[in-house]
């Protein structure tokens, strides 16, 4: 049975070698300096099944976190959902947020973009740039990220039906600017089943829509390995009337 001191000597030490602890005082409101880890061992209980049931931070099954030192080393990425009007306007907003200390970007697209329509399509009238940024072309995507280092920030894009096309535009912009795809980090929502059940922003029938999602799963890890190819959105399904069990499923 592995003990707490084993984890500190092995996993935690290796984690700190990669990302040292943040230069702040890790103390509670009662001015207590907490240990990097607490287990049943701290109250005198040696549970032989603990490692299998809960595990340790940075180790399978990752119940206690995917990194050994977790937020002692690096806080979670903080990104405000942002996007409105034109690509120029949203680019200006992105730069303002990054200057203020934001550590990632989260792109809000307008309804025509979410539905796969160009801004000049008749059905787009009155909706262009209203609830997010309008992106109809590669040129729009270039403007959207002009002056932003795509290897230094991660980008989350709340896009589903046209996710593969929008992501392709993003990667094309990165390639044109000379960035290495293997260093790019980010997320595409890409949860098309949520669209059919809840949000209703779908373009194609379920079967070909799911096939497009699968295509990103197959191609992505080989070419953009640090990217998250789906963000499952159970929240929307619950808001549309599902039970908690259906949301989880």
Kindly give the residue locations of the regions a language model identified.
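Catalytic alpha/beta active-site cores
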Residues: 1-249
